């Protein structure tokens, strides 16, 4: 969204969640000390008693999820527990992209049994033109949800919001880029990484010819007027490109023009695939034998769903080929966005609290049914949104996502 226009969202005055020592670079002076993460999320709008020390956590080893409801992995899922109408676990071996990808180029599903790390960014742009109201609430809600439902420990989350006193916790361009590097640092196969951005988004003319619409997607740090925006190409280079096969990165963008913020080559709508490399042709040839029917790791168990295919009109095959060559990834990257690139994200007043519509719908849909496929979840999010808004959710992926 153009940062000069007001867009969603009542401000929330809470503080950030504490982290452990940030190993790469300590802030110059650190008046805050924090040892153990609080076992329960704080309630209401009061910040926690312990100050956030601005340090980024070193992710702990993944907890054991056996017998815990709502957390499926390749070993503990409804299929293995006797429900054979549920999807089978994902293949653990590398899987081919199929036509349109470089020769011998594979991706690998994450078993999501390893470390869990999350980076959550919420920017209300206090005292700036175009101030927003609900972005910090989005982050507060998402962090609580990840902690209570998906086993993300508070000490393995970095929260950047512009209501925090510590300068290291402000969502400045430098802090956001540093935190993006932290998120993917030392990621190993079967780790689960989560990225959430709620704030202003926008578009800028595409300089390298890789976007269908001629524009790159951008996000606006709190200091964008001085430091500039962050382009999708840079987010892809930092957070997607370095990932090893078998690492899961889930990203949610609740901002205007966020439909392709991570620059991933496969884009899904509730009707089917919007952008894909020759997959429609492969479907006709019966080559879509690889099924990403995945016991859902972070998000939801894949269940049988038919996906319709159609091609998005692009500005030319050259841009298309360039994207496929440079933006596919051997990792397992999934992105949810609150608006397609030609839409704007909506304001929301849910139960008297200002929130981003996408963030709210994502959590609401999963609360109602945690065992959903990606495509079902996309439709559930659409249903949640359609009751109140015109906004259409979108799902992007670094690899073919097909549930048969």
From Swiss-Prot:
It is an enzyme of class 3 (hydrolase). Its EC number is 3.4.22.-. It comes from the Eukaryota. SUPFAM superfamilies: Caspase-like (SSF52129). Residues 1-10 have a biased composition (Basic residues). One of its GO terms (biological process) is proteolysis. Involved in cell death (apoptosis). GO terms for molecular function: cysteine-type endopeptidase activity. GO terms for cellular component: cytoplasm. InterPro entries: Caspase-like_dom_sf (IPR029030), Metacaspase (IPR050452), Pept_C14_caspase (IPR011600). The gene is casA. The active site is at 200, 256. Residues 1-100 are annotated as: Disordered. Residues 24-51 have a biased composition (Low complexity). This is Metacaspase-1A. Disulfide bonds: none annotated. The lineage of its organism: Eukaryota, Fungi, Dikarya, Ascomycota, Pezizomycotina. Keywords: Apoptosis, Hydrolase, Protease, Thiol protease, Zymogen.
């Amino acid at each position: 969204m153009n940062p000069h226009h007001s867009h969603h969202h009542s401000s929330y005055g809470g503080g950030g969640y504490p982290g452990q020592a940030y190993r790469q670079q300590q802030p110059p002076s650190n008046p805050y000390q924090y040892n153990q993460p609080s076992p329960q999320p704080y309630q209401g709008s009061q910040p926690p008693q312990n100050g956030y020390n601005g340090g980024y956590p070193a992710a702990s080893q993944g907890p054991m999820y056996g017998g815990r409801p709502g957390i499926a992995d390749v070993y503990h899922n409804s299929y293995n527990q006797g429900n054979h109408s549920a999807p089978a676990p994902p293949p653990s071996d590398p899987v081919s992209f199929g036509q349109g990808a470089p020769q011998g180029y594979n991706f690998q599903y994450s078993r999501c049994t390893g470390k869990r790390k999350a980076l959550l960014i919420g920017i209300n742009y206090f005292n700036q033109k175009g101030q927003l109201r609900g972005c910090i609430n989005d982050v507060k809600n998402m962090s609580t949800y990840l902690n209570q439902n998906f086993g993300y420990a508070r000490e393995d989350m970095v929260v950047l919001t512009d209501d925090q006193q510590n300068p290291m916790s402000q969502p400045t361009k430098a802090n956001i880029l540093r935190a993006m590097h932290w998120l993917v640092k030392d990621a190993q196969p079967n780790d689960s990484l989560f990225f959430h951005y709620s704030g202003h988004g926008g578009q800028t003319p595409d300089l390298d010819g890789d976007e269908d619409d001629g524009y790159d997607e951008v996000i606006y740090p709190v200091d964008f007027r001085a430091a500039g925006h962050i382009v999708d190409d840079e987010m892809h280079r930092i957070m997607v490109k370095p990932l090893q096969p078998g690492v899961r990165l889930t990203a949610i963008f609740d901002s205007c023009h966020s439909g392709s913020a991570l620059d991933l080559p496969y884009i899904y709508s509730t009707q089917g695939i919007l952008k894909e490399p020759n997959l429609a042709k492969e479907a006709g040839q019966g080559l879509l034998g690889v099924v990403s029917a995945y016991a859902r790791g972070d998000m939801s168990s894949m269940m049988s769903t038919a996906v319709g295919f159609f091609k998005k009109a692009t500005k030319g095959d050259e841009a298309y080929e360039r994207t496929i060559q440079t933006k596919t990834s051997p990792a397992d990257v999934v992105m949810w966005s609150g608006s397609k690139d030609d839409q704007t994200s909506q304001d929301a007043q849910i139960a008297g609290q200002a929130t981003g519509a996408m963030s709210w719908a994502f959590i609401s849909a999963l609360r109602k049914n945690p065992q959903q496929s990606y495509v079902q979840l996309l439709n559930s999010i659409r249903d949640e949104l359609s009751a109140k808004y015109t906004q259409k959710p979108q799902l992007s992926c670094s690899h073919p996502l097909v549930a048969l």
